[in-house]
């Protein structure tokens, strides 16, 4: 004879896979055109010179050169640009 009542099943216990966001190439690093610099949600980093953005807001290099991070404007926005070598 059972000494415990049957335990009910839970409806939780799920989690999504990590999306591997963040900075992939840091300031001063050399990059080739097409290299991903930052993976992000929204516009935490804005595109500066020689930087493009994908449809998921990924920032990537449009030209070969060195990565440069800078804060500009009255709202202190973070911009990424590529300085040609």
From Swiss-Prot:
Q: Which GO terms describe its biological process?
A: translation
UniProt keywords, alphabetically: Ribonucleoprotein, Ribosomal protein
Residue segments, region Disordered: 1-22
Family annotation (SUPFAM superfamilies): Ribosomal L27 protein-like
Output the Pfam families linked to this UniProt entry: Ribosomal_L27 (PF01016)
| Claim: Chloroplast is one of the keywords in the record | no
Recorded GO molecular functions are: structural constituent of ribosome
User: Which Gene Ontology CC terms are recorded?
Assistant: cytosolic large ribosomal subunit
Family membership noted in the UniProt record: Belongs to the bacterial ribosomal protein bL27 family.
Q: Which NCBIfam families match?
A: L27
From the Swiss-Prot or TrEMBL record, give the protein name.
Answer: Large ribosomal subunit protein bL27
Which organism does this record belong to? Escherichia coli O6:K15:H31 (strain 536 / UPEC)
């Amino acid at each position: 004879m059972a000494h415990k009542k049957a335990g009910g099943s839970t409806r939780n216990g799920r989690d999504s896979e990590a999306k591997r966001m963040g900075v992939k190439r840091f300031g001063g690093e050399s990059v080739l055109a097409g290299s991903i610099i930052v993976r992000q949600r929204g516009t935490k980093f804005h595109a500066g010179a020689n930087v493009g953005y994908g449809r998921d807001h990924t920032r990537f290099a449009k030209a070969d050169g060195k990565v440069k991070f800078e804060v500009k404007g009255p709202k202190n926005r973070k911009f990424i640009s590529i300085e040609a070598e």
